[in-house]
Design a protein with these regions (language model features):
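Surface-exposed peri-terminal alpha-helical interaction modules
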Residues: 1-268
Length: 268
């Protein structure tokens, strides 16, 4: 664990067992800097990772054993909901930096390729957070958001703001280039997955925000951001990009342990 005043947890979980949170499928707080609304000179280039040695990839079983008790299912899918969203916030931060760097570089290609990979990673997190059965979502997750705020909405996510236009499919300056075309394809895939997850979890199609009278909605964006961060155990402090990446890697290792045992859809 970092010895600095922000107390970020960056060590990777051990490979031979669970080492995230205080118990299997426990949670940890995430510490992020403020969202990257502007280019930051002190942020390293966001580039694609080197391929794994030998091209090896970790498999993700589609299914696995069902949790034996409702309490175990609630714990597992609560972990996925919170930790998967925390991963998404870190991905959005890196995506925002890569977007700024693409605008600033004479050759935006490396940044666009990184943005394509990050968009695919975000889509994977949608599948992960949305893997819970409908009854767990309706009985546990949706009520927890309602208790946090009656109009709780994903549109309040602070880290989404810098990448909102990109992820909503607006044209970029590079849409006619090969790299820009591949990025646009990934954004379209994200929209398909997002629509599918929403249709599965909320068959009626109405969010908490849509079900709430306007008088119950916070009108101050700062309050919205605080409420949203608080729900997902996310703190804000001036932490370097390297610590953001290490916190992301720590959570990815925990997710990998989870799906290797339980599959993406346990008991399906």
């Amino acid at each position: 664990m970092s010895a600095g005043p922000h107390r970020t947890v960056t060590e990777l979980p051990v490979a031979e067992g669970w080492d995230f949170g205080d118990f299997p499928y426990g949670l940890e707080p995430l510490t992020l800097p403020e969202p990257p609304h502007e280019p930051a000179a002190d942020v390293p280039d966001v580039l694609c990772a080197e391929p794994a040695p030998g091209g090896a990839r970790t498999s993700c079983p589609r299914t696995g054993p069902a949790p034996g008790l409702p309490e175990l299912a609630h714990q597992l899918f609560w972990f996925r909901w919170i930790t998967g969203h925390q991963l998404t916030f870190a991905i959005w931060q890196l995506l925002g930096h890569a977007l700024h760097q693409a605008h600033a570089r004479p050759d935006p290609g490396p940044s666009l390729r990184a943005m394509t990979d990050l968009t695919r990673a975000y889509t994977a997190m949608l599948l992960y957070t949305g893997s819970c059965p409908k009854d767990v979502y309706s009985d546990v997750i949706r009520p927890s958001m309602f208790l946090q705020h009656r109009g709780f909405s994903g549109t309040w996510a602070p880290d989404f703001v810098p990448v909102r236009r990109l992820l909503r499919g607006r044209k970029t300056p590079w849409h006619e280039t090969p790299e820009g075309g591949r990025l646009a394809d990934e954004v379209r895939l994200y929209h398909l997955v997002h629509s599918g997850v929403a249709a599965k979890l909320v068959p009626g199609g109405r969010s908490l925000l849509q079900d709430t009278a306007p008088t119950a909605r916070p009108h101050d964006p700062r309050m919205q951001a605080l409420v949203y961060d608080n729900y997902f155990l996310t703190l804000r402090a001036d932490v370097p990009t390297a610590e953001v990446v290490e916190q992301l890697r720590r959570r990815l290792a925990a997710v990998r342990l989870d799906v290797s045992v339980n599959g993406l859809y346990p008991g399906l």
